[in-house]
């Protein structure tokens, strides 16, 4: 006579027998499905080349304007006259390079007090 424990053993042997190998988890199948969804979405949202060209030209124009403004600013700063004593004072007191001290003085139109205040803040 079979007891409850025997029935459970028989069921386990039937499902894991040599006829049916246990199925392996399919890890990569979900990635393929995700990729298919992404490509479908990308096809729906095609980028028009005219929009892309317009965006690139806007970015290029903005960059060229920024570069031109930077060059003009550098020309203005180069026109400012600074005293050698002021430059050396800032270099020794603030312990910064000559280029940084000169830049600070030029940005503050040669005013050593304003340059020192800006460097300490």
Swiss-Prot record:
Molecular function as annotated in GO: protein folding chaperone
Report the residues modified as Phosphoserine: 30
Q: Which Gene3D superfamilies match?
A: DNA helicase RuvA subunit, C-terminal domain
Q: Which CDD domains match?
A: UBA_HYPK
Classify the source by domain of life.
Eukaryota
The effect annotated for residue 35 to A is: Reduces ability to inhibit NAA10-NAA15 complex-mediated N-terminal acetylation, which results in increased N-terminal acetylation
Bilayer-crossing regions = none
Consequence recorded when altering residue 28 to A: Reduces ability to inhibit NAA10-NAA15 complex-mediated N-terminal acetylation, which results in increased N-terminal acetylation
What is one term from the GO cellular component aspect held by the record? microtubule cytoskeleton
> Which InterPro entries did the record assign?
Huntingtin-int_K (IPR052617), HYPK_UBA (IPR038922), NAC-like_UBA (IPR044034)
Q: Which UniProt keywords apply?
A: Coiled coil, Cytoplasm, Nucleus, Phosphoprotein
Q: Where is this region: Disordered?
A: 1-75
Q: Name one GO biological process term.
A: protein stabilization
Main location group: nucleus
Q: Which residues form a coiled coil?
A: 62-107
Location of the region described as Required for association with the NAA10-NAA15 complex in the Swiss-Prot/TrEMBL record: 52-121
| Physiological role | Component of several N-terminal acetyltransferase complexes. Inhibits the N-terminal acetylation activity of the N-terminal acetyltransferase NAA10-NAA15 complex (also called the NatA complex). Has chaperone-like activity preventing polyglutamine (polyQ) aggregation of HTT in neuronal cells probably while associated with the NatA complex. May play a role in the NatA complex-mediated N-terminal acetylation of PCNP.
| Oligomer status and interactors | Component of the N-terminal acetyltransferase A (NatA)/HYPK complex at least composed of NAA10, NAA15 and HYPK, which has N-terminal acetyltransferase activity. Within the complex interacts with NAA10. Within the complex interacts with NAA15. Predominantly interacts with NAA15 in the NAA10-NAA15 complex (also called the NatA complex); the interaction with the NatA complex reduces the acetylation activity of the NatA complex. Interacts with HTT (via N-terminus). The NatA complex is required for HYPK stability and for reducing polyQ aggregation of HTT.
The protein in question is named Huntingtin-interacting protein K
């Amino acid at each position: 006579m079979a007891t409850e424990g025997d029935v459970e053993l028989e069921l386990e042997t039937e499902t894991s027998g040599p006829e049916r190998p246990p199925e392996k988890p399919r890890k990569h199948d979900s990635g393929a499905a995700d990729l298919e969804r992404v490509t479908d979405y990308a096809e729906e949202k095609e980028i028009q080349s005219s929009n892309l060209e317009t965006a690139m030209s806007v970015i290029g124009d903005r960059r060229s304007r920024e570069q031109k403004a930077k060059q003009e600013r550098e020309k203005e700063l180069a026109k400012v006259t600074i005293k050698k004593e002021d430059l050396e004072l800032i270099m020794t007191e603030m312990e910064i390079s000559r280029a940084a001290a000169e830049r600070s003085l030029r940005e503050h139109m040669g005013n050593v007090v304003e340059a020192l205040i800006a460097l300490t803040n």
